[in-house]
Amino acid sequence: MNGGDDAATSGPPPSLEWRFSQVFGERTAGEEVQEVDIISAIEFDKSGDHLATGDRGGRVVLFERTDTKDHGGSRKDLEQTDYPVRHPEFRYKTEFQSHEPEFDYLKSLEIEEKINKIRWCQPANGALFLLSTNDKTIKYWKVQEKKIKKISEMNIDPSESSNIPPQLVTNGLPADKGHDYLSKDFSFPPGGIPSLRLPVVVTSQETNLVARCRRVYAHAHDYHINSISNSSDGETFISADDLRVNLWNLEISNQSFNIVDVKPTNMEDLTEVITSAEFHPIHCNMLAYSSSKGSIRLIDMRQSALCDSHTKLFEEPEAPGSRSFFTEIIASISDIKFSKDGRYILSRDYMTLKLWDINMDSGPVASYQVHEHLRPRLCDLYENDSIFDKFECCLSGDGLRVATGSYSNLFRVFGASQGSTEAATLEASKNPMRRQIQTPARPSRSIGSMTRVVRRGSESPGTEANGNAYDFTTKLLHMAWHPTENSIACAAANSLYMYYA
């Protein structure tokens, strides 16, 4: 996807071999998973040294990288030295309760505590900052190490009190005058007050992580919040629900600006809803949002205060004669992500990953079929509501690969560079490669000067490549790619698995 002429002459990079790195919260055989422990959001920070997860119980858990601290340098620096390159290692840092269950008495509506999204903000003065949201309320958190203060001893030794001249300790006045002056109100012992002993507070070298909520952004969404995204200006962010996108300033919690509103005058005329929204990683005036009809709109906030019109519309024309009852349901986009340079947008609908060039709105430059073999079972998936599952997607920092999840705790990794045939299936377990399949791409067809590629998966209906039946109760919805390395974090129920290549 990136690399220009050099990549074209050297060919696509070789396929990666993925290895297990770590697991947090691993389940034992037969252990029942509590609903509140299921992970619902994952996000790396920009440096890749911190990872945050949110769960359905409203908690945010932070992890920090440890392998770079051992040698005091980044992984890139270590690769240029004689140190053996170790795989990325993270450790538990802290956790805090971000959201609590609430009840909206005006609408008689329960608001669950589940964390929908987490986004990291710019760190400052050694403190970490992040945004977390549930269905209705966004919170801005500051996480900082603070030194623990302890009471060590009293300030004056009792034995020293006898050496203090009595005339100097009576209310700051000479003993004789002070006693006479206050004798009407107070009674002092003869000779004045003995020395006052106060505890001495000493700052120890021990530190404690403290999470403090700095802002609460509430009462701005009538519908469930599905997305939050930081602007590259470091000062603003957007939040999106089914019908609106709002713009916030991080420092102002009681005011937001509605920049996108797709709510019709008559709700009976509603044909699509907003499913995901994301700021451009470089240009703070541009953002994209996806819809339940499978389209992506790129808007420029400089055009007008309310962005009713889009700068570009990305949608794939429907193939003639292919429409069915499920066509519109599976076309709904569940997640979009910009590439690091902002040139491409990756989208995930129920069956496919699609890669879009923002300079070409005629169609995606590549499509990756995630679980095409489930198409004959769409009726079953509709009946058990699995067809409405919202899978996330992610891109590698170099833009050469894309990834997304599937059922049976499987996830797919595809090569995104021109000519690549990489298409791996991995399992969220300690042996990720045991179900791997490598399937060559179909012949690509040209669109103008670009190339559209379609990569297919296993074709056996309702089964995995090794013949096992798909388990629709175990699904890998949430995953994140490290910003600078080939390292993936993914959530399988309450377990966080990490892999590297």
Swiss-Prot record:
Residue ranges of WD repeats: 34-73, 110-151, 220-258, 269-309, 328-366, 471-501
Record's keyword terms, sorted: Acetylation, Repeat, WD repeat
Region annotated Disordered, chain positions: 439-466
A GO molecular-function descriptor: protein phosphatase regulator activity
Gene Ontology BP annotations: protein dephosphorylation
One GO CC term, this protein: protein phosphatase type 2A complex
Biased composition (Polar residues): 439-449
Span of the signal peptide: none
Similarity comment: family membership: Belongs to the phosphatase 2A regulatory subunit B family.
Subunit-structure text: PP2A consists of a common heteromeric enzyme, composed of a catalytic subunit (subunits C), a constant regulatory subunit (subunit A), and a variety of regulatory subunits such as subunits B (the R2/B/PR55/B55, R3/B''/PR72/PR130/PR59 and R5/B'/B56 families). Interacts with SIC/RON3.
PANTHER family (alphabetical): PROTEIN PHOSPHATASE PP2A REGULATORY SUBUNIT B
Function field: The B regulatory subunit may modulate substrate selectivity and catalytic activity, and may also direct the localization of the catalytic enzyme to a particular subcellular compartment.
Protein name per the record: Serine/threonine protein phosphatase 2A 55 kDa regulatory subunit B beta isoform
